[in-house]
């Protein structure tokens, strides 16, 4: 006979098992830093070997088409499988704000240029940020992350 306690335990297992396996994607590698003062180890993220090319999500080079949605789709797809590399290929890419998520390595290939739009409304809705040390809602920064971990911006 199944008790309510057994049913609840099974339900928790079903809910939390995918979350635990999702978090396994990124590993941390400690790096010792020589400093003239006591300092804890720095940890580098070792991201899974998965690439998400923004062109597969509709991005077009040339600096004329706004690629904000395509880049966001690539970031979301990468995040949903536990992380990896979102690749910005060689070329000029017009975009609005880029909102990173956990376990994302935003990778710029050699010759890749991000051109951020100069249209203020592209940086809305407002996000929590800081201005002169005060937390406030404001236009989104060019590259933004909030409540994230294991993120990097790398490239050649």
Residue ranges and their predicted role:
Residues 2-9, 21-87, 92-156:
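Extracellular "leader-to-stem" segments immediately downstream of a signal peptide or signal-anchor
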Residues 13-21:
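Hydrophobic h-region of N-terminal signal peptides that target proteins for export
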């Amino acid at each position: 006979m199944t008790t309510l306690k057994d049913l609840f335990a099974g339900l928790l297992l079903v809910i939390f098992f995918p979350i635990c396996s999702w978090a396994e994607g990124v590993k941390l590698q400690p790096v010792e830093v020589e400093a003239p003062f006591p300092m804890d180890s720095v940890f580098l993220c070792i991201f899974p070997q998965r690439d998400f090319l923004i062109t597969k999500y509709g991005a077009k080079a040339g600096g004329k088409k706004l690629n904000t949605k395509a880049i966001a789709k690539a970031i979301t797809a990468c995040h949903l499988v536990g992380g990896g590399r979102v690749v910005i290929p060689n070329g000029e890419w017009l975009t609005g704000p880029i909102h990173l998520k956990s376990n994302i390595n935003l990778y710029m290939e050699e010759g890749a240029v991000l051109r951020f739009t100069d249209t203020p409304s592209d940086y809305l809705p407002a996000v929590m940020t800081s201005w002169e040390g005060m937390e406030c809602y404001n236009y989104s920064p060019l590259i933004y992350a909030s409540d994230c971990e294991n993120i990097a911006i790398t490239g050649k």
